[in-house]
Amino acid sequence: MRLLKTEAIVLKNNLIGETDKIATLFTKSYGKLQAVAKGARRSKSRFVNAIRPFVVANYVIFEGQNYYYIDQWELIEAHKNIEKDLAKFSVASYIAETINKILEENQKSERLYLFLKHSLKAVDELQIDPLIFISSYNLKLVSLLGYMPQLDNCVVCGKRENLKYFSNSCGGAVCINCKNKCFDAKPLHEVTLKAIKYFLKGDYDKLQNIKVSGVIKEEVDKIITAYMKEHLEIEFKSKDFINNLQNM
């Protein structure tokens, strides 16, 4: 019987059997795996809080015949503020969904793990605008995965002037002279380009007091969402809920 000891973040959980739950964990040492928490559906179970979404904890997990099973756990961070705030919860749910869909089973990435941990901590502790935070998170995520958009120079010719378009297929900003060389080049407002650069390079705490118009926020969101779809070939369902929150 193999015994695993690792820090992990709960991405989601589901019901299994009559009294158990199965959690999707992103572990620091072993990547993504599914682990059963026996009796976790009982209110007095010692595992009732062990697999709540977004919990960070140290786990002792053993490998059974068909599943991994949680044997022991010690809480590191509960992220209680996320539980109390619908906007924070929706952003955290989106973040967890992106990581879950990107990672294959048993795929390890300490850089991605630390990025997820940092992002959830920011959602929990900071005052956030959901759309601004998600745009910043998405830009940082695609960059971490190797798809950073080119924003300071034309992605085609390298010139820094007249960056008036953005192309998903070409991978970033495009100047006026090169717009016809990228079939999907779309007009890009100068303020939108500045916002994208700021969201990409600035840490989350710098986003708290930034003033961005609703039009620019939505334009940035549309650009980055389309860019992610182009390069990751994944769509995320929880993003729709965040968009609905913005319109409430």
From Swiss-Prot:
The keyword Transferase does not apply. GO terms for cellular component: bacterial nucleoid. Gene3D superfamilies: Nucleic acid-binding proteins, Recombination protein O, C-terminal domain. GO terms for biological process: DNA recombination; double-strand break repair. Keywords: DNA damage, DNA recombination, DNA repair. It holds the Pfam family RecO_C. Involved in DNA repair and RecF pathway recombination. Belongs to the RecO family. This is DNA repair protein RecO.
